[in-house]
């Protein structure tokens, strides 16, 4: 609790909002600038696929590309959702597969809706 003298000298610090990139939108469209790989934190080892994306509001973010294999290239349009990857620090967004220029995971049988795959008949 602040005293009156402390409030006179310094105003209260306002809390920052969590994500300025999305505001209240569930997804946002962006343009892929660069696709590269990154290694995860200590106990895990792999090459996770990452894309640098320029959003519609002119901000640049890093997003994780889920699933096995992708055909994402520079200058492709992608749809982004919120959601962090636990073993990649600083990556707070994911690419939605099967929408715009991103194709779904091929030959996927289970959890198809997460990876944008149509039902195989």
Swiss-Prot record:
PROSITE patterns the UniProt entry points to: RIBOSOMAL_S12
Respond yes or no to whether keyword rRNA-binding is given for this record.
yes
Annotated compartments: Plastid, Apicoplast
GO terms under cellular component: apicoplast; small ribosomal subunit
Recall the GO molecular function terms of this protein's record. Answer: rRNA binding; structural constituent of ribosome; tRNA binding
Q: Which Pfam families match?
A: Ribosom_S12_S23
Give the keywords, sorted: Apicoplast, Plastid, Ribonucleoprotein, Ribosomal protein, RNA-binding, rRNA-binding, tRNA-binding
Sorted alphabetically, which InterPro entries does this protein's record hold?
NA-bd_OB-fold, Ribosomal_uS12, Ribosomal_uS12_bac
Q: Which GO terms describe its biological process?
A: translation
Subunit notes for this chain?
Answer: Part of the 30S ribosomal subunit.
Q: Which family does it belong to?
A: Belongs to the universal ribosomal protein uS12 family.
Per the entry, what this protein does is:
With S4 and S5 plays an important role in translational accuracy. Located at the interface of the 30S and 50S subunits.
Put simply, this protein is called Small ribosomal subunit protein uS12c
What is the species of this protein?
A: Toxoplasma gondii
**Lineage of origin:** Eukaryota, Sar, Alveolata, Apicomplexa, Conoidasida
What gene, per UniProt, encodes this protein? rps12
